[in-house]
Amino acid sequence: MNIGRIVTAMVTPFNEQDQVNLEATCQLVNELIANGSDALVVGGTTGESPTLTTDEKMALFHTVVEAAGGRVPVIAGTGSNNTRASIELSKKVEDLGVDGIMLVTPYYNKPSQEGLFQHFKAISESTSLPIMLYNIPGRSGVNLDAETTLRLAELRNIVSIKEASGNLDQIAEIIEHSPADFSVYSGDDSLTLPLLSIGGTGVVSVASHIIGNEMQEMVQLFLSGQVERAAAIHRKLLPLMKTLFMTPNPTAVKAALELKGLPVGHVRLPLVPLTAEEQRQLELAINPQFNMFVS
């Protein structure tokens, strides 16, 4: 499964009635494709998946596949902390035309490494779709160790991982010892360039909603050997990347998209909108050099 270098973990637009806004979703898909996204992850944790019903997820997946129209791969977020529910949803999306699925590490129940292995193995055996694992210990409460990831990488349809542990030693071990066709993506925007430097593939990004073309330029410069120019862009983008995570994701990036004129709406409870001070910080971080204008 070739999904490129800059993969955007899409937010889920909501309207004023707190319903999924499918019209705005189509608009967002077109905006992201036009601005540097090589692939889209839909209904993941950036898409507030724990707050979505199964029917909402299915409608979202269908809408994004239709809107993308084969221009970029679409990855459906079907993971949860319920193995059986993840299996059921992974089976359901096979008929929608998605190109793969993403499975987050189970949150709250804190399984052992063997429990994590068996969870992902059971889901992989239930579907023919390519699978991207998603390790995010800061939110799930458990780290998917390198050894466990490498065991999973041997399974036929587990083909990549979004690594958001922030542990470059662990990530380097995975890159060094995984099969040649196993792809490792950064799950942290700010670690995109460092991960590329140790042999990673790219990033599953939140910031690409706002600075996708700039991130794409950074990656392409690095790949062409222009490391100093890539590093300069990295340093330039870093303050905005950090600001987008000053509150629980995706609160700030949704506010930033609204500033760009994209009607993605609010976050669902239990998340809450930015405070006035946080909004001010966000507006200061949206630099005119990115051709972003705050009205």
Curated annotation (Swiss-Prot):
Q: What is its main location?
A: cytoplasm
Cite the Pfam families for this sequence.
DHDPS
Coiled-coil segments: none
Q: What is its EC number?
A: 4.3.3.7
GO terms for biological process?
A: diaminopimelate biosynthetic process; lysine biosynthetic process via diaminopimelate
Q: Which residues are pyruvate-binding? A: 46, 204
A GO molecular function annotation here is:
4-hydroxy-tetrahydrodipicolinate synthase activity
| HAMAP family xref list | DapA
Q: How does it assemble?
A: Homotetramer; dimer of dimers.
Which protein, by its recorded name, is this? 4-hydroxy-tetrahydrodipicolinate synthase 1
**What is the taxonomic lineage of the source species?**
Bacteria, Bacillati, Bacillota, Bacilli, Bacillales
Gene name for this UniProt entry: dapA1
